């Protein structure tokens, strides 16, 4: 009689486990049937409308950053400025452009690039540099004078996660003066 009770409980437990597994299997199928579209690059298309550059850096052929201080990114004016030491070669560098979540960049960065055309020539004023690093004042002065941007400056388009919003950013390089 005792073995019959144990066998009955084992049968009940098997049925319960089977029901749980069936429920989980059905739930998994229901979730996997949702349509998650992908773009031509195989990236997930989301509902995110954010579309901006959050950081900008350049690396030399030794894979070391050539950035001096912090890059200045103005998401309203769609301008990214990176500062380098005087005389730093910028003709064979690898850009690293950080974007908001789910966004992508066009054109894609697939090779070393020449950023010489993005170099700005400008006159500096008191307060542009603090302890050898660029100040926000300098970035704001540059952004507020778009007529001074080189016509050959690098341009990249940021495309939002929903793939509907596109914003073109201008990437500029400013050399710190000799000190």
Give the ranges of each region predicted by the language model.
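Sec-dependent bacterial lipoprotein signal peptides
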Residues: 1-32
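Beta-rich interaction/scaffold domains
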Residues: 33-179
């Amino acid at each position: 009689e005792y073995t019959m009770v144990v066998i009955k409980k084992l049968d009940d437990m098997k049925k319960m486990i089977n029901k749980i597994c069936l429920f989980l299997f059905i739930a998994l199928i229901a979730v996997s049937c949702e349509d998650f579209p992908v773009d031509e690059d195989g990236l997930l298309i989301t509902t995110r409308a954010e579309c901006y550059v959050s950081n900008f850096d350049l690396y030399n052929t030794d894979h070391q950053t050539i950035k001096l201080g912090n890059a200045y990114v103005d998401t309203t004016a769609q301008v990214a400025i990176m500062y380098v030491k005087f005389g730093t070669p910028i003709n064979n560098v690898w850009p690293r452009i950080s974007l908001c979540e789910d966004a992508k960049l066009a054109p894609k960065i697939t090779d070393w690039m020449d950023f010489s055309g993005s170099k700005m020539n400008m006159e500096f004023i008191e307060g542009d540099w603090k302890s050898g690093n660029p100040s926000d004042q300098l970035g704001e002065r540059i952004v507020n004078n778009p007529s001074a941007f080189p016509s050959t400056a690098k341009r990249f388009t940021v495309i939002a996660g929903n793939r509907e919003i596109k914003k073109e950013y201008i990437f500029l390089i400013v050399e710190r003066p000799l000190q």
